[in-house]
Amino acid sequence: MKWLLLLGLLALSECIVHKVPLVRKKSLRKNLIEKGLLQDYLKTHTPNPATKYFPKETFATVSTESMENYLDAEYFGTISIGTPPQDFTVIFDTGSSNLWVPSTYCSSLACALHKRFNPEDSSTYQGTSETLSITYGTGSMTGILGYDTVKVGSIEDTNQIFGLSKTEPSLTFLFAPFDGILGLAYPSISSSDATPVFDNMWNEGLVSQDLFSVYLSSDDEKGSLVMFGGIDSSYYTGSLNWVPVSYEGYWQITMDSVSINGETIACADSCQAIVDTGTSLLTGPTSAISNIQSYIGASKNLLGENVISCSAIDSLPDIVFTINGIQYPLPASAYILKEDDDCTSGLEGMNVDTYTGELWILGDVFIRQYFTVFDRANNQLGLAAAV
């Protein structure tokens, strides 16, 4: 009897899913609008989501990664670093691979208004001579790399490499609702070859399965989760459909087509798509997105937002993404973002050099509709309709 109980406990331990709650907050864009600063920001920062995936230059020890993509980010979680633990609010970003937070080495105003990691207060911190630089448009966040214990939910990830900022551009981060970024993409795109957090978790045997899953609730504040080491079927309906990863860097897949009312409007001969929790909107080629915006009646306001009449939502068609032979419809209630009496399009155009071909970014607008499993063991994504 005792052996049966022990075996049952062992089986249960192997199925533990470590759930990390995410909170939905006002985005940096909304904060800048409220402060009357968005127009000034956009004069010197031209958001182009493509720069996140195709940085202009890469160095051996100093890497680049655009920060404008986080202008619309709304989902954030809490982690801790060091001994005793120091808490930070981060974006769990499947479109990048590094972990970085502000530090006491940073004297920028943006750092002063956010939580800063103090290595002198941590008995487990180990410094390095390696550097990190992340571009944001007209300037950059610079920092150094170090090692320490990182706690994510109930998981204690020891000897984790991460970035400590030394300078941060004020306007970009001053009103940001997050302290740093926790990247969940493949190690091949990690700056300075730093081991990503999830890879370290798996290497140390801290998760029972080499995968994690994401549920983004449509609720205004609570209910969203990142689940490490497992899948919870109570967050989706039907069965998971699996899609092979086409490039083991980002969570990139091949998409068959994009259609409206049965007519293909983009990606006619298949194209590439990246599933990215760090991108709030659904992004595609500028011409295709422009055509869709016109079709649904969206028009730009003075702040550069594509506004639309809220009364039109019920009459607008689904945008259908066909992936690996399966159709994933996105209703207007998903791609039109409603706040109070204002409605804006959740679609955004981006410019990509022609040699890369047609590329789409399936951001939070898509992930809210479809529970997503990021399966590293089999290099595949699982998609199912979210509850």
Curated annotation (Swiss-Prot):
- Where found? Secreted
Q: Name one Pfam family in it.
A: Asp
What SUPFAM superfamilies does this protein's entry cite?
Acid proteases
Q: Which cysteines share a disulfide bond?
A: 106-111, 267-271, 310-343
What catalytic activity is recorded?
Answer: Preferential cleavage: hydrophobic, preferably aromatic, residues in P1 and P1' positions. Cleaves 1-Phe-|-Val-2, 4-Gln-|-His-5, 13-Glu-|-Ala-14, 14-Ala-|-Leu-15, 15-Leu-|-Tyr-16, 16-Tyr-|-Leu-17, 23-Gly-|-Phe-24, 24-Phe-|-Phe-25 and 25-Phe-|-Tyr-26 bonds in the B chain of insulin
Cite a GO CC annotation.
extracellular region
Q: Which residues form the propeptide?
A: 16-59
- Using the record's annotations, give every residue carrying the modification Phosphoserine: 129
Please tell me where this protein is predominantly located: secreted
Give this protein's Gene Ontology molecular function annotations: aspartic-type endopeptidase activity
Q: What EC number is given for this enzyme?
A: 3.4.23.1
What role does it play? Shows particularly broad specificity; although bonds involving phenylalanine and leucine are preferred, many others are also cleaved to some extent.
What name does UniProt use for this protein?
A: Pepsin II-2/3
Natural source organism? Oryctolagus cuniculus (Rabbit)
